[in-house]
């Protein structure tokens, strides 16, 4: 009996440690999103060591070794099933949207190809890459019909409308801009509000799995795979389900 109680205690302790770790990851993700959202574009490029034309091919290859592929491998089938069920409960959000977000897609990316001899004279290349190959610092282009492939910071937006119902349950389209707090014309979030600020309210950030309803945008990839906002939430939900 004592052995059984000890086992239960150890299990509870391990679950508690895991829960704390997940909460820490969620907080780090939130802090990163807020920091990137409130920086100016030049500062964002400096943070990710990228340029307006994107990463070099060589650097992108290095980063995929560091960050891994942009995909969610754990409990993927269960997540897909839950999303499909939710899609039937949310008006206007079709199962096709969910399928589009889960299937292998490609996205338009700009990268720089340098001379193999000198490493200089970079040539800008526009290419369609599988979303799994995206890394932080990549420059991507979004337009109507696209599923957002990663957490991204918008640097240019043209009448951009996004459906975030997969995260919020609210089917109303949300307009996104180049600047955080565009409507209030503020650049920085007050420190006293920072702790409890909801990342989903950031007006210049789009989240992995959300859907472009209208307009177009250019954006920098902030987080990929399990490190995205939805990726961390999926991890938490998978543990509790």
Question: What are these language model-derived features?
Answer:
Residues 1-241:
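Conserved cytosolic headpiece of P-type ATPases
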């Amino acid at each position: 009996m004592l052995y059984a109680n000890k086992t239960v205690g150890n299990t509870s302790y391990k679950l508690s440690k895991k829960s704390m770790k997940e909460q820490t990851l969620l907080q780090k993700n939130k802090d990163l999103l807020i920091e990137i959202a409130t920086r100016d574009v030049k500062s964002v490029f400096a943070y990710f060591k990228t340029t307006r034309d994107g990463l070099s091919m060589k650097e992108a290859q290095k980063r995929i070794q560091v960050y891994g592929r942009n995909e969610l491998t754990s409990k993927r089938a269960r997540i897909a099933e839950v999303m499909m069920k939710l899609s039937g409960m949310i008006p206007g959000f079709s199962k096709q949207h969910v399928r589009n977000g889960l299937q292998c897609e490609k996205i338009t990316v700009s990268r720089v190809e340098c001379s193999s001899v000198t490493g200089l004279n970079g040539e800008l290349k526009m290419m369609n890459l599988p979303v799994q190959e995206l890394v932080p610092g990549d420059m991507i282009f979004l337009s109507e019909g696209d599923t957002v492939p990663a957490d991204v910071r918008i640097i240019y937006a043209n009448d951009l409308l996004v459906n975030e119902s997969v995260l919020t349950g609210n089917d109303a389209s949300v307009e996104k801009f180049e600047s955080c707090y565009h409507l209030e014309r503020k650049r920085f979030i007050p420190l006293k509000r920072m702790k409890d600020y909801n990342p989903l309210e950031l007006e210049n950030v789009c989240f992995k799995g959300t859907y472009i309803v209208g307009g177009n945008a250019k954006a920098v990839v902030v987080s990929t795979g399990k490190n995205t906002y939805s990726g961390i939430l999926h991890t938490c939900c998978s543990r509790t389900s």
